[in-house]
Protein backbone atom coordinates (compact mmCIF):
# COMPACT_ATOMS: atom_id res chain seq x y z
CA UNK A 1 0.00 0.00 0.00
CA UNK A 2 1.08 3.59 -0.66
CA UNK A 3 0.62 4.53 3.01
CA UNK A 4 3.00 1.75 4.03
CA UNK A 5 5.68 2.89 1.59
CA UNK A 6 5.43 6.53 2.73
CA UNK A 7 5.51 5.42 6.36
CA UNK A 8 8.74 3.47 5.78
CA UNK A 9 10.37 6.64 4.42
CA UNK A 10 9.21 8.69 7.41
CA UNK A 11 10.57 6.06 9.81
CA UNK A 12 13.91 5.95 8.01
CA UNK A 13 14.09 9.73 8.44
CA UNK A 14 13.72 9.37 12.21
CA UNK A 15 16.92 7.25 12.27
CA UNK A 16 15.97 5.14 15.29
CA UNK A 17 17.71 1.98 14.05
CA UNK A 18 18.77 -0.52 16.72
CA UNK A 19 17.38 1.68 19.50
CA UNK A 20 14.68 0.46 21.85
CA UNK A 21 11.42 2.20 20.92
CA UNK A 22 8.00 2.22 22.57
CA UNK A 23 4.54 2.82 21.11
CA UNK A 24 1.66 4.31 23.11
CA UNK A 25 -1.27 2.00 22.31
CA UNK A 26 -4.80 2.75 23.50
CA UNK A 27 -6.39 -0.07 21.51
CA UNK A 28 -8.11 2.34 19.13
CA UNK A 29 -7.71 2.11 15.37
CA UNK A 30 -4.99 4.79 15.11
CA UNK A 31 -2.60 3.29 17.65
CA UNK A 32 -3.21 -0.28 16.44
CA UNK A 33 -2.35 0.78 12.88
CA UNK A 34 0.76 2.57 14.16
CA UNK A 35 1.86 -0.53 16.08
CA UNK A 36 1.29 -2.71 13.00
CA UNK A 37 3.27 -0.32 10.77
CA UNK A 38 6.22 0.00 13.16
CA UNK A 39 6.37 -3.76 13.78
CA UNK A 40 6.44 -4.32 10.00
CA UNK A 41 9.11 -1.63 9.53
CA UNK A 42 11.27 -3.09 12.32
CA UNK A 43 11.07 -6.56 10.78
CA UNK A 44 12.07 -5.28 7.33
CA UNK A 45 14.97 -3.24 8.74
CA UNK A 46 16.01 -6.07 11.10
CA UNK A 47 15.52 -3.79 14.12
CA UNK A 48 14.25 -4.81 17.56
CA UNK A 49 10.42 -4.96 17.68
CA UNK A 50 8.68 -2.06 19.45
CA UNK A 51 7.47 -2.19 23.04
CA UNK A 52 3.72 -1.59 23.46
CA UNK A 53 2.64 0.64 26.36
CA UNK A 54 -1.03 0.81 27.35
CA UNK A 55 -2.29 3.28 29.96
CA UNK A 56 -5.28 2.29 32.07
CA UNK A 57 -6.93 5.49 33.30
CA UNK A 58 -9.69 3.53 35.03
CA UNK A 59 -12.27 6.14 34.02
CA UNK A 60 -14.62 3.72 32.24
CA UNK A 61 -15.86 0.20 33.15
CA UNK A 62 -14.26 -1.25 30.01
CA UNK A 63 -10.80 0.32 30.61
CA UNK A 64 -9.21 -2.84 32.04
CA UNK A 65 -10.61 -5.00 29.26
CA UNK A 66 -9.19 -2.60 26.63
CA UNK A 67 -5.63 -2.60 27.98
CA UNK A 68 -5.73 -6.40 28.25
CA UNK A 69 -6.81 -6.49 24.59
CA UNK A 70 -3.78 -4.32 23.71
CA UNK A 71 -1.38 -6.75 25.40
CA UNK A 72 -2.86 -9.87 23.77
CA UNK A 73 -3.27 -8.34 20.29
CA UNK A 74 0.20 -6.77 20.34
CA UNK A 75 1.57 -10.30 20.81
CA UNK A 76 -0.39 -11.43 17.72
CA UNK A 77 1.19 -8.58 15.74
CA UNK A 78 4.71 -9.71 16.67
CA UNK A 79 5.42 -7.52 19.68
CA UNK A 80 7.56 -9.29 22.27
CA UNK A 81 7.01 -6.95 25.23
CA UNK A 82 3.90 -5.07 26.36
CA UNK A 83 3.22 -3.23 29.59
CA UNK A 84 0.11 -1.83 31.28
CA UNK A 85 0.60 1.46 33.15
CA UNK A 86 -2.09 2.23 35.72
CA UNK A 87 -3.10 5.76 36.68
CA UNK A 88 -3.53 6.01 40.43
CA UNK A 89 -5.75 9.06 40.37
CA UNK A 90 -6.65 11.08 43.44
CA UNK A 91 -9.34 13.72 43.97
CA UNK A 92 -10.03 14.57 40.33
CA UNK A 93 -11.53 18.03 39.99
CA UNK A 94 -12.17 20.21 36.95
CA UNK A 95 -11.25 19.05 33.45
CA UNK A 96 -10.97 15.25 33.73
CA UNK A 97 -9.81 14.79 30.12
CA UNK A 98 -6.99 17.30 30.57
CA UNK A 99 -5.81 15.68 33.80
CA UNK A 100 -6.01 12.21 32.27
CA UNK A 101 -3.98 13.36 29.27
CA UNK A 102 -1.31 14.91 31.51
CA UNK A 103 -1.16 11.77 33.65
CA UNK A 104 -0.94 9.57 30.54
CA UNK A 105 2.14 11.36 29.23
CA UNK A 106 3.76 11.43 32.66
CA UNK A 107 3.29 7.66 33.02
CA UNK A 108 4.55 6.97 29.49
CA UNK A 109 7.63 9.20 29.67
CA UNK A 110 8.51 8.08 33.20
CA UNK A 111 8.39 4.45 32.09
CA UNK A 112 10.59 5.25 29.09
CA UNK A 113 13.18 7.05 31.21
CA UNK A 114 13.26 4.25 33.78
CA UNK A 115 13.74 1.64 31.05
CA UNK A 116 16.28 3.47 28.87
CA UNK A 117 13.82 3.98 25.99
CA UNK A 118 14.60 7.27 24.29
CA UNK A 119 11.89 7.25 21.58
CA UNK A 120 8.13 7.08 22.17
CA UNK A 121 5.77 6.85 19.18
CA UNK A 122 2.35 8.51 19.32
CA UNK A 123 -0.52 7.85 16.86
CA UNK A 124 -1.62 11.44 16.17
CA UNK A 125 -2.72 11.94 12.57
CA UNK A 126 -3.76 14.76 10.22
CA UNK A 127 -7.35 15.02 11.50
CA UNK A 128 -6.06 15.23 15.09
CA UNK A 129 -3.85 18.11 13.99
CA UNK A 130 -6.79 20.04 12.50
CA UNK A 131 -8.98 19.43 15.57
CA UNK A 132 -6.18 20.52 17.90
CA UNK A 133 -5.74 23.74 15.92
CA UNK A 134 -9.45 24.58 16.24
CA UNK A 135 -9.48 23.77 19.96
CA UNK A 136 -6.48 26.00 20.61
CA UNK A 137 -7.86 28.77 18.42
CA UNK A 138 -10.99 28.82 20.58
CA UNK A 139 -8.85 29.00 23.74
CA UNK A 140 -6.93 31.99 22.40
CA UNK A 141 -3.58 30.21 22.06
CA UNK A 142 -0.55 32.11 20.80
CA UNK A 143 1.68 31.14 17.90
CA UNK A 144 3.31 28.24 19.73
CA UNK A 145 -0.06 26.66 20.48
CA UNK A 146 -1.44 27.25 16.99
CA UNK A 147 1.59 25.62 15.39
CA UNK A 148 0.12 22.48 16.97
CA UNK A 149 1.94 19.15 16.95
CA UNK A 150 5.30 18.37 15.35
CA UNK A 151 6.63 15.14 13.94
CA UNK A 152 9.33 15.24 16.58
CA UNK A 153 9.24 16.90 20.01
CA UNK A 154 10.63 16.34 23.50
CA UNK A 155 8.74 15.80 26.74
CA UNK A 156 10.31 15.01 30.11
CA UNK A 157 13.55 14.12 28.36
CA UNK A 158 11.90 11.61 25.99
CA UNK A 159 11.76 12.08 22.20
CA UNK A 160 8.12 11.94 21.04
CA UNK A 161 7.64 10.84 17.41
CA UNK A 162 4.42 11.19 15.40
CA UNK A 163 4.88 9.46 12.03
CA UNK A 164 1.14 9.46 11.15
CA UNK A 165 0.75 13.26 11.01
CA UNK A 166 0.78 13.16 7.19
CA UNK A 167 -2.11 10.70 7.01
CA UNK A 168 -5.84 11.29 7.35
CA UNK A 169 -8.22 9.26 9.49
CA UNK A 170 -9.82 7.83 6.34
CA UNK A 171 -6.47 6.56 4.96
CA UNK A 172 -5.67 4.94 8.30
CA UNK A 173 -9.09 3.23 8.26
CA UNK A 174 -8.45 1.87 4.74
CA UNK A 175 -5.12 0.46 5.90
CA UNK A 176 -6.74 -1.20 8.93
CA UNK A 177 -9.46 -2.73 6.75
CA UNK A 178 -6.93 -3.95 4.17
CA UNK A 179 -4.96 -5.86 6.82
CA UNK A 180 -8.12 -6.86 8.72
CA UNK A 181 -6.78 -5.40 11.95
CA UNK A 182 -8.77 -5.47 15.19
CA UNK A 183 -9.34 -2.50 17.45
CA UNK A 184 -11.65 -1.23 20.17
CA UNK A 185 -14.05 1.69 19.80
CA UNK A 186 -13.89 4.25 22.60
CA UNK A 187 -17.50 5.44 22.94
CA UNK A 188 -16.37 8.63 24.66
CA UNK A 189 -14.93 9.75 21.29
CA UNK A 190 -18.53 10.26 20.15
CA UNK A 191 -19.64 12.14 23.26
CA UNK A 192 -20.81 15.69 22.53
CA UNK A 193 -19.77 16.84 25.99
CA UNK A 194 -16.19 16.98 24.71
CA UNK A 195 -15.14 19.93 22.55
CA UNK A 196 -12.94 17.78 20.32
CA UNK A 197 -16.00 15.79 19.23
CA UNK A 198 -17.81 19.03 18.35
CA UNK A 199 -14.94 20.19 16.13
CA UNK A 200 -14.65 16.74 14.55
CA UNK A 201 -18.33 16.93 13.63
CA UNK A 202 -17.90 20.52 12.43
CA UNK A 203 -15.20 19.44 9.97
CA UNK A 204 -17.42 16.59 8.74
CA UNK A 205 -20.38 18.94 8.28
CA UNK A 206 -18.32 21.41 6.22
CA UNK A 207 -18.94 19.43 3.03
CA UNK A 208 -15.25 19.52 2.10
CA UNK A 209 -13.61 17.92 5.13
CA UNK A 210 -10.45 16.69 3.40
CA UNK A 211 -9.69 20.06 1.78
CA UNK A 212 -10.45 22.01 4.96
CA UNK A 213 -8.31 19.66 7.06
CA UNK A 214 -5.47 19.97 4.54
CA UNK A 215 -5.67 23.79 4.61
CA UNK A 216 -5.69 23.90 8.41
CA UNK A 217 -2.62 21.65 8.55
CA UNK A 218 -0.90 23.86 5.98
CA UNK A 219 -1.64 26.88 8.18
CA UNK A 220 -0.04 25.13 11.16
CA UNK A 221 3.11 24.62 9.05
CA UNK A 222 3.25 28.33 8.18
CA UNK A 223 2.87 29.21 11.86
CA UNK A 224 5.54 26.67 12.84
CA UNK A 225 8.03 28.30 10.47
CA UNK A 226 7.29 31.67 12.05
CA UNK A 227 7.74 30.31 15.58
CA UNK A 228 11.09 28.77 14.64
CA UNK A 229 12.26 32.18 13.42
CA UNK A 230 11.10 33.77 16.68
CA UNK A 231 12.94 31.12 18.69
CA UNK A 232 16.12 31.82 16.72
CA UNK A 233 16.04 35.46 17.78
CA UNK A 234 15.04 34.51 21.33
CA UNK A 235 18.20 32.40 21.58
CA UNK A 236 20.27 35.34 20.40
CA UNK A 237 18.57 37.56 22.99
CA UNK A 238 19.49 35.11 25.76
CA UNK A 239 23.15 35.52 24.85
CA UNK A 240 22.89 39.33 25.13
CA UNK A 241 20.46 39.75 28.03
CA UNK A 242 20.69 36.82 30.41
CA UNK A 243 23.16 35.60 33.00
CA UNK A 244 22.59 32.09 34.34
CA UNK A 245 24.16 32.03 37.79
CA UNK A 246 25.81 29.10 39.55
CA UNK A 247 23.60 29.79 42.57
CA UNK A 248 20.54 28.60 40.63
CA UNK A 249 18.84 31.76 39.42
CA UNK A 250 18.59 33.85 36.26
CA UNK A 251 19.40 37.53 35.87
CA UNK A 252 17.91 39.54 32.99
CA UNK A 253 19.75 42.77 32.20
CA UNK A 254 17.07 45.42 31.75
CA UNK A 255 19.22 47.74 29.62
CA UNK A 256 19.28 45.05 26.90
CA UNK A 257 15.80 43.68 27.63
CA UNK A 258 14.14 47.03 26.89
CA UNK A 259 15.71 47.08 23.40
CA UNK A 260 14.05 43.83 22.33
CA UNK A 261 10.86 43.52 20.26
CA UNK A 262 8.01 42.70 22.65
CA UNK A 263 7.45 39.16 21.37
CA UNK A 264 11.13 38.26 21.83
CA UNK A 265 11.26 39.88 25.28
CA UNK A 266 8.11 38.04 26.36
CA UNK A 267 9.53 34.71 25.22
CA UNK A 268 12.78 35.40 27.04
CA UNK A 269 10.89 36.05 30.27
CA UNK A 270 8.67 32.99 29.72
CA UNK A 271 11.53 30.53 29.19
CA UNK A 272 13.48 31.99 32.11
CA UNK A 273 10.52 31.30 34.39
CA UNK A 274 9.92 27.83 32.96
CA UNK A 275 13.52 26.67 33.39
CA UNK A 276 13.77 27.89 36.99
CA UNK A 277 10.37 26.45 37.93
CA UNK A 278 11.22 23.13 36.18
CA UNK A 279 7.73 23.04 34.65
CA UNK A 280 7.16 21.75 31.14
CA UNK A 281 3.85 23.58 30.81
CA UNK A 282 3.65 27.30 30.27
CA UNK A 283 2.06 29.53 32.91
CA UNK A 284 -1.29 31.14 32.13
CA UNK A 285 -0.91 33.89 29.56
CA UNK A 286 -2.89 36.47 31.56
CA UNK A 287 -0.60 36.01 34.58
CA UNK A 288 2.55 36.13 32.45
CA UNK A 289 1.55 39.22 30.47
CA UNK A 290 0.62 41.10 33.65
CA UNK A 291 4.15 40.59 35.01
CA UNK A 292 5.67 41.39 31.61
CA UNK A 293 3.81 44.71 31.46
CA UNK A 294 5.04 45.58 34.96
CA UNK A 295 8.61 44.93 33.87
CA UNK A 296 8.15 47.16 30.81
CA UNK A 297 7.10 50.10 33.00
CA UNK A 298 10.61 51.22 33.82
CA UNK A 299 9.86 53.04 37.06
CA UNK A 300 7.86 50.15 38.54
CA UNK A 301 9.02 47.97 41.39
CA UNK A 302 8.56 44.33 40.41
CA UNK A 303 7.80 41.87 43.19
CA UNK A 304 5.72 38.96 41.81
CA UNK A 305 5.40 35.19 41.96
CA UNK A 306 4.48 32.83 39.13
CA UNK A 307 4.89 29.08 38.56
CA UNK A 308 6.91 28.58 41.72
CA UNK A 309 9.25 31.47 40.92
CA UNK A 310 9.86 34.90 42.40
CA UNK A 311 10.29 37.66 39.83
CA UNK A 312 12.17 40.59 41.39
CA UNK A 313 13.57 43.87 40.19
CA UNK A 314 17.04 44.16 41.74
CA UNK A 315 19.14 47.15 40.72
CA UNK A 316 19.18 47.29 36.93
CA UNK A 317 18.13 43.67 36.51
CA UNK A 318 15.16 41.34 36.80
CA UNK A 319 15.90 38.21 38.82
CA UNK A 320 14.07 34.91 38.38
CA UNK A 321 14.49 33.07 41.69
CA UNK A 322 13.07 29.71 42.74
CA UNK A 323 10.37 30.03 45.39
CA UNK A 324 11.78 28.05 48.33
CA UNK A 325 8.36 27.01 49.65
CA UNK A 326 7.68 25.18 46.34
CA UNK A 327 10.84 23.05 46.51
CA UNK A 328 10.37 19.39 47.32
CA UNK A 329 12.73 17.96 49.94
CA UNK A 330 14.33 14.61 49.17
CA UNK A 331 15.65 11.95 51.54
CA UNK A 332 18.73 9.86 50.68
CA UNK A 333 20.99 7.37 52.40
CA UNK A 334 24.71 8.09 52.69
CA UNK A 335 27.18 7.36 51.33
CA UNK A 336 25.99 8.09 47.78
CA UNK A 337 27.59 6.40 44.79
CA UNK A 338 26.57 9.07 42.28
CA UNK A 339 25.36 12.69 42.08
CA UNK A 340 21.68 13.29 42.77
CA UNK A 341 19.39 15.76 41.00
CA UNK A 342 17.77 18.35 43.26
CA UNK A 343 14.90 20.63 42.20
CA UNK A 344 15.93 20.14 38.56
CA UNK A 345 18.41 23.01 39.03
CA UNK A 346 21.36 21.33 40.71
CA UNK A 347 23.36 18.15 40.55
CA UNK A 348 24.44 17.43 44.14
CA UNK A 349 27.46 15.31 45.01
CA UNK A 350 27.61 14.46 48.71
CA UNK A 351 31.10 13.44 49.83
CA UNK A 352 31.94 11.65 53.07
CA UNK A 353 31.92 8.18 54.58
CA UNK A 354 29.14 8.56 57.13
CA UNK A 355 26.39 5.97 56.90
CA UNK A 356 23.12 7.69 57.69
CA UNK A 357 19.84 8.96 56.27
CA UNK A 358 19.75 12.66 55.39
CA UNK A 359 17.38 15.18 53.85
CA UNK A 360 18.33 17.66 51.13
CA UNK A 361 16.13 20.67 51.76
CA UNK A 362 16.03 24.36 50.80
CA UNK A 363 18.19 26.58 53.02
CA UNK A 364 15.06 28.54 53.96
CA UNK A 365 14.17 25.69 56.33
CA UNK A 366 17.14 26.55 58.57
CA UNK A 367 16.11 30.24 58.78
CA UNK A 368 19.80 31.10 58.65
CA UNK A 369 22.19 32.24 55.92
CA UNK A 370 25.77 31.03 56.58
CA UNK A 371 28.44 33.71 56.63
CA UNK A 372 30.34 32.45 53.57
CA UNK A 373 27.28 32.96 51.33
CA UNK A 374 27.07 36.62 52.28
CA UNK A 375 30.29 37.17 50.34
CA UNK A 376 28.32 36.66 47.13
CA UNK A 377 27.09 39.95 45.74
CA UNK A 378 23.49 39.02 44.99
CA UNK A 379 19.94 39.33 46.28
CA UNK A 380 19.69 37.54 49.68
CA UNK A 381 16.46 35.79 48.58
CA UNK A 382 18.59 33.68 46.24
CA UNK A 383 20.20 31.88 49.18
CA UNK A 384 16.97 30.47 50.57
CA UNK A 385 16.41 28.33 47.45
CA UNK A 386 19.85 26.66 47.72
CA UNK A 387 20.23 23.07 48.99
CA UNK A 388 21.40 22.15 52.48
CA UNK A 389 21.99 18.66 53.89
CA UNK A 390 20.09 18.01 57.13
CA UNK A 391 20.34 15.13 59.58
CA UNK A 392 17.62 14.91 62.22
CA UNK A 393 16.65 18.49 61.40
CA UNK A 394 20.17 19.85 61.97
CA UNK A 395 22.64 21.08 59.35
CA UNK A 396 25.11 18.36 58.38
CA UNK A 397 26.59 20.16 55.37
CA UNK A 398 26.16 23.46 53.57
CA UNK A 399 26.71 23.66 49.85
CA UNK A 400 29.99 24.26 48.06
CA UNK A 401 30.14 25.29 44.42
CA UNK A 402 32.12 22.80 42.35
CA UNK A 403 34.99 25.24 41.76
CA UNK A 404 35.21 25.95 45.52
CA UNK A 405 35.51 22.33 46.62
CA UNK A 406 38.22 21.41 49.10
CA UNK A 407 39.76 18.24 50.46
CA UNK A 408 37.94 16.74 53.43
CA UNK A 409 38.72 13.99 55.87
CA UNK A 410 36.60 10.85 56.14
CA UNK A 411 34.46 12.10 59.02
CA UNK A 412 33.30 15.26 57.25
CA UNK A 413 30.39 15.55 54.86
CA UNK A 414 30.51 17.97 51.95
CA UNK A 415 27.77 18.89 49.45
CA UNK A 416 29.17 19.92 46.06
CA UNK A 417 26.64 21.50 43.70
CA UNK A 418 26.68 22.06 39.96
CA UNK A 419 23.96 24.15 38.33
CA UNK A 420 22.10 22.29 35.56
CA UNK A 421 20.08 25.31 34.40
CA UNK A 422 22.08 25.89 31.22
CA UNK A 423 21.65 22.27 30.15
CA UNK A 424 17.93 22.49 30.91
CA UNK A 425 17.64 25.64 28.78
CA UNK A 426 19.12 23.74 25.86
CA UNK A 427 16.50 21.00 26.29
CA UNK A 428 13.63 23.46 26.81
CA UNK A 429 14.34 26.02 24.12
CA UNK A 430 17.48 24.96 22.28
CA UNK A 431 19.38 27.87 23.85
UniProtKB/Swiss-Prot annotation:
Keywords, in A-Z order: ATP-binding, Cytoplasm, Ligase, Nucleotide-binding, tRNA processing
Highest rank taxon of the organism: Bacteria
SUPFAM superfamilies, per database record: Adenine nucleotide alpha hydrolases-like
Any GO CC annotation of this UniProt entry: cytoplasm
Pfam name, any one: ATP_bind_3
Location of the protein in the cell: Cytoplasm
The keyword Cell membrane is assigned to this record: no
Binding-site list for ATP: 26-31
Enzyme class per UniProt: ligase
Record's catalysed reaction(s): cytidine(34) in tRNA(Ile2) + L-lysine + ATP = lysidine(34) in tRNA(Ile2) + AMP + diphosphate + H(+)
Alphabetized GO MF terms: ATP binding; tRNA(Ile)-lysidine synthase activity
Enzyme Commission numbers on file: 6.3.4.19
Keyword Nucleotide-binding annotated: yes
One biological process term in Gene Ontology: tRNA modification
Similarity section: Belongs to the tRNA(Ile)-lysidine synthase family.
Purpose of the protein: Ligates lysine onto the cytidine present at position 34 of the AUA codon-specific tRNA(Ile) that contains the anticodon CAU, in an ATP-dependent manner. Cytidine is converted to lysidine, thus changing the amino acid specificity of the tRNA from methionine to isoleucine.
Domain notes per entry: The N-terminal region contains the highly conserved SGGXDS motif, predicted to be a P-loop motif involved in ATP binding.
Cited PANTHER family: TRNA(ILE)-LYSIDINE SYNTHASE-RELATED
Name the UniProt record assigns to this protein: tRNA(Ile)-lysidine synthase
Species name: Wolbachia sp. subsp. Brugia malayi (strain TRS)
